[in-house]
Structure formats: C-alpha cells, structure tokens
Design a protein with these regions (language model features):
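Catalytic active-site module of serine/aspartate enzymes centered on a nucleophile-bearing elbow/loop
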Residues: 282-312
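Conserved alpha/beta-hydrolase "acid-adjacent" motif
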Residues: 264-270
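N-terminal export signals
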Residues: 2-3, 9-29
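Active-site loop/oxyanion-hole signature of alpha/beta-hydrolase fold enzymes
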Residues: 83, 90-134, 296, 304
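Conserved hydrolase catalytic core segment
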Residues: 126-165
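Short beta-strand/loop motif that positions the catalytic acidic residue
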Residues: 251, 257-259
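Conserved HGGG/HGGXW glycine-rich cap/lid loop of the alpha/beta-hydrolase fold
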Residues: 46-101
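Conserved alpha/beta-hydrolase catalytic His-Asp/Glu region
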Residues: 162-174, 184-249
Length: 312
C-alpha cells in the first residue's frame, strides 16, 4: 500500500465518521440495544425460532424442515408462495437452527406440540402445512391432532410416514443397523457426516451424470452445523422409529403426497406407497429419477405442483 493510498483511506474513514455524527438521533436509536429474533416459548419453556412473512390476513402456508436442517431449507418455496400472495411461516425445530438447544424432548410428540403452540401463538387458521422428510412426520402427527379450524390441507414431501425402521410388522423397512450407523457417524465426526450426506445420497449427487450443486451441499452443511448434536442424535430415533399409521388414518383434510422415485434416504416403497393407502383424502404424485431433496434440486417443478394443490 502506497503512502498516498493510505492518506486517501484515512480521509475516507474520517469523512464517514463525520457523516455518522450528523445522522438524526432517531435513526441512531434504532441500532441501540440487543437485536432479537422472533421466537415463541412452548408449553415446556423451549424457545422456538420462526420466520413469518407476508400479509397477516392471507392464508398461511407453514413449512416443516427435514433432519438435521432448519427453516432456511424452505427459502425458495417461502419466497415463491409469498409472491403468490400467501402468508409464509417456517420454524426451526427444537434443538435445530436458531431454536433453543434443549437436552430433552426430541421426539415427534414434542415436535407436534411445538407446532401447536406456534399455531396458537400466531393464531394460524385454515393453514396449509408442508413437511419434508422428518418434517412430514411432524406434519402428520400435528395435523392428526390439530385444533378444529387450524388446518386446511397438508403436503408430505419425501416424508418418513408411516414408519421407516424394519420390524416384524414392517419387514421391508430400513434395517435398524442403518440408523445405528447414522448415530455412530454423527457422534464420531458430525462435521464430516454432514458433508457426506448432501454430497452423496440426499440430492442424488452420487448418481452418474448428476449435476452437482456445491451451493446446496454447503447450505445443507451450514444448516446442520447450526443445530445441536444432542437434538440431531436423538432425532434419528424420532424420524426412524416413530409409527405414524394411526396419524395418517386420522387425518380428514386433503393431503398431497409427493416423492422422488430415486429417493435413497426415504425409499418410496416403504413410505409414500404405503402412506397413500392409509390416508382418507390423499393424492400421490411421484417423480421419476428425482432424489430425496427434490424440492431443492427442482424447485420450479415442485413449486408449481404445490401451488396447484394450495389453490385447488
């Protein structure tokens, strides 16, 4: 750096500082005090972060993220539905993202209760709930038990219901050893595991000829690492061993089930193909060749189908 450049930079800095002191005190006052995030306190005192955009009198669309991510996973869909005139809401599940990293309560009953508390706090009525993967299980558990008038419709994308893990009653499910492997990998090196998942099966980037998005991989890792290891560890049991059979049977509202046919994380035969048979008012649409994270890799396609369902 030359002496002349140094003098110029000093003068620029001095000018900026002088300009700051000429700002109205009302503007400066806006920056005083701690910055706060939008949160609600649930019935057990857990702080849940949420985003709430759009007209408060518009129909709400509530987005439920997958494991181990956050509400940010729905940014594309939130902006899309916002542009279509909806009120859009996304929360970070307890222990995930910006929500409180509590030690306990990482199970579907607590997840659904947190959603109920959020819906009550924001006075959400006639809402459309859209859930991906673990978030689809959360939607099923919540909608099946929701207060009258709260829910209009639901959509399950690459969702885990009715139940993932193999058992005597679910012999073609995913072996428990697979989920034990998830837990071991997370405990050993969560940062590396959270790179391996999105760069491999989650978006289908391990398939020959796949168009890999480095941005999606990094964003998945960013979201995952912002949450708590305890919540993520316990959450594996929540999404793999929870049985949603009775929840699906109890739902009376219209439900759209969307699933990628090349989903390597939540195989379609053990999820969507079974779930649709349990729903009273369900519609199934599948996508040849698409992966578990299909709404992120093909947002225009999925957004159009979700919007058509919302308007139907």
């Amino acid at each position: 750096m030359t002496p002349d450049l140094t003098r110029r930079e000093i003068l620029k800095g001095a000018t900026a500082a002088a300009a700051l002191f000429t700002l109205p005190t009302s503007i400066l006052a806006q920056t005083e005090g701690p910055l706060t995030m939008a949160t609600i306190s649930t019935r057990d005192g857990t702080e849940i972060f949420y985003k709430d955009w759009g007209p408060k009198d518009a129909q709400p669309v509530v987005f439920h993220h997958g494991w181990p991510l956050s509400g940010d996973d729905w940014d594309n869909q939130m902006l899309f539905f916002l542009g279509e005139g909806y009120r859009v809401i996304a929360h970070d599940r307890r222990g995930h993202g910006r929500s409180q990293q509590v030690s306990d309560g990482h199970d579907m009953d607590h997840y659904a209760a947190d959603v109920a508390d959020l819906a009550r706090a924001l006075d959400l009525r006639d809402a459309i709930h859209i859930g991906h993967s673990t978030g689809g299980g959360e939607v099923a558990r919540y909608v099946a038990n929701a207060e009258p008038g709260r829910v209009a419709k639901a959509a399950l994308l690459g969702a885990v219901p009715p139940i993932m893990v193999a058992s005597e009653t679910n012999p073609d499910g995913v072996p428990l050893e697979v989920f034990d492997g998830f837990r071991a990998a997370l405990a050993a090196n969560r940062a590396q595991f959270f790179l391996d998942v999105p760069s491999g099966p989650f978006y289908g980037f391990n398939r020959e000829g796949a168009e890999v998005s480095e941005g999606l991989i990094r964003n998945w890792w960013r979201q995952g690492m912002s949450g708590g290891a305890k919540a993520h560890y316990d959450g594996i049991r929540a999404f793999s061993e929870t049985d949603f059979t009775e929840d699906l049977k109890a739902i009376t509202q219209p439900v759209l089930v969307l699933h990628g046919e090349d989903d390597q994380v939540v195989p379609i035969d053990n999820s969507a193909h079974k779930a649709i048979k349990l729903l009273r008012n369900g519609t199934l649409k599948t996508y040849p060749g698409l992966s578990h994270g299909f709404f992120a890799t093909h947002p225009d396609l999925i957004n159009a189908d979700l919007l058509a369902f919302a308007r139907s």
